Amino acid sequence: IVCGGRSDAATRFIEPTLMDEVPLDSPLMTEEIFGPVFPMITLDDEGNSFKDKVIEFVTNREKPLAFYYFGKEAEGWEIIRRTSSGGGCINDVIMHIANENVPFGGVGNSGMGMYHDKESFEAFSHRRSIIATGTWIDLPFRYMPYKMFGLVKKIL
């Protein structure tokens, strides 16, 4: 634990907590986190470019609900373009959730759909496609046997 870590079950309080050197097979890295606990991943910059290591790290795992990148902004944008996540920030955390005008949601195993503002309404709505056909004429080529199919193909 780098900082934080205090909790109080009676008041349901969990202090925002930063954790470093978390094993990649730890539940903190393999399960969704519903609390102010942030595992940090540090990648060395030897060998392949750092940006490529980040992209490889992200794309070799399940798509994250959120992706937070700290580093050069231009590299951050390239990494975001080449990876997939629900949302994210460059050189910040949480702000994509805090803004009610910015949709938030997951992709892949971290969920489907977005919420906040109009997206909340859409997420809990069901849009149906309905086709209404008039009864004044019922074209026989819709039904078997399809004898008139050749004629329809010629017309089209």
Where are these regions (language model features)?
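Short, solvent-exposed loop/turn elements at beta->coil junctions and helix N-caps
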Residues: 4-9, 93-94
